[in-house]
């Protein structure tokens, strides 16, 4: 079974990329298509580990530098942004896994997985919670993320992010319940076995400036 957007991965490293995404997703206990969707849109539809945005974030999930620094801290280790941008796909997928691994087994939807990528402090918060913290004010986050402007009052709430995401939900992901995906093994683009995952996931396009809160 093909993963979401796997045909968009550059052919030169597609097979190895997909295999590694599946391996990572099994460890994280998530649907590998969620991770594929995040990387596709975060990298501006390129799956390039060197893709940069306008405010210094780089890579497959747009790693953002720590505030005022030239490095990104992940699980206590500092990674120079210049080094992250030079990583090949395999090296950076290892970093992607390191970023998510503390949430292994806790991500029950695409929305959960996206909030880990976008603003972890928002995970588990009520829909009316104003997104802020981590050294960033609500106003700063608002200005950096116009895609989520619903009320347009200088702040972004959790429900505004969800609403934007749901606007781009593909019809095949609308069904709730347990979905069976073939992810046990991957050989010559043939995946066999099953992984039980929670559906009701979402896709959306997001390629605005990031707030650096990851």
Where are the predicted features?
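Intrinsically disordered, highly charged
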Residues: 1-23, 27-29, 167-185, 208-214
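Catalytic glycan-binding domains that act on GlcNAc-containing polysaccharides
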Residues: 2-149, 153, 161
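Single-pass alpha-helical membrane anchors
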Residues: 183-213
């Amino acid at each position: 079974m093909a993963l979401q957007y796997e045909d968009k991965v550059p052919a030169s490293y597609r097979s190895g990329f997909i295999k590694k995404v599946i391996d990572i997703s099994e460890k994280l206990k998530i649907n590998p298509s969620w991770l594929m969707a995040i990387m596709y849109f975060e990298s501006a539809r390129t799956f390039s580990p060197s893709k940069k945005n306008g405010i210094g974030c780089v890579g497959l999930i747009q790693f953002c530098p720590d505030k005022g620094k030239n490095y990104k801290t992940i699980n206590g280790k500092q990674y120079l942004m210049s080094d992250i941008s030079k990583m090949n796909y395999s090296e950076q997928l290892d970093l992607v896994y390191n970023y998510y691994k503390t949430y292994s087994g806790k991500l029950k939807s695409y929305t959960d997985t996206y909030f880990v990528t976008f603003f972890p402090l928002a995970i588990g918060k009520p829909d009316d919670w104003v997104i802020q913290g981590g050294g960033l004010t609500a106003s700063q986050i608002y200005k950096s993320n116009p895609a989520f402007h619903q009320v347009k009052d200088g702040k972004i709430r959790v429900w505004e992010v969800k609403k934007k995401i749901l606007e781009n939900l593909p019809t095949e992901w609308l069904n709730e319940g347990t979905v069976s995906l073939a992810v046990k093994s991957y050989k010559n683009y043939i995946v066999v076995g099953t992984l039980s995952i929670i559906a009701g996931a979402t896709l959306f396009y997001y390629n605005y400036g990031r707030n650096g809160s990851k």
